[in-house]
């Protein structure tokens, strides 16, 4: 798509600033189920609907493939600080991870250009009553990319040699690897460092709160 289309998307996102999620939901032409409202990913789904993300574009695609843009929301408190790490993408734990490089990785595609939308409201505020903040588009600086790449490569090195379960919250400067599953009984196969097939909880990459905080400050 042309630059105008990116500008159109950005202006649409900017136009949401100041509205509550409840107001945005009421503007949609389709009903929203009660189960979705109670879901942690509810706000993100509503933003996808209102901004025109094609939910059928495939699991491995970014949200706006023709623009090369991923959509991410950041829950922040009334002081503007992120409430939680930001989920980026799931991590492949199978042997096909061996052929992944930084530039051809799903993770890289996900973070190459991001449309960030802050969602304002402390933890006690219901999803519907949270307020949309001012959107901004972010692309990595050379310094940011160097740090992100270093973290990513260190994590992938551990995963490739079968040491995913050795990864802790202490690893990574701006990235985190965390368990990503509804409950501890959800498991997937991986090959451990002894070459044995084992089961573990799915993992995902997250931006640390301190990193998204720095992005929010740079956007001002």
Curated annotation (Swiss-Prot):
The keyword Thylakoid does not apply. GO terms for molecular function: DNA binding; endonuclease activity. GO terms for biological process: DNA modification; mismatch repair. The keyword Ion transport does not apply. Keywords: Cytoplasm, DNA damage, DNA repair, Endonuclease, Hydrolase, Nuclease. It is found in: Cytoplasm. GO terms for cellular component: cytoplasm. Its main location: cytoplasm. InterPro entries: DNA_mismatch_repair_MutH (IPR004230), DNA_rep_MutH/RE_typeII_Sau3AI (IPR011337), DNA_rep_MutH/T2_RE_sf (IPR037057), Restrct_endonuc-II-like (IPR011335). SMART domains: MutH. Belongs to the MutH family. Sequence-specific endonuclease that cleaves unmethylated GATC sequences. It is involved in DNA mismatch repair. This is DNA mismatch repair protein MutH.
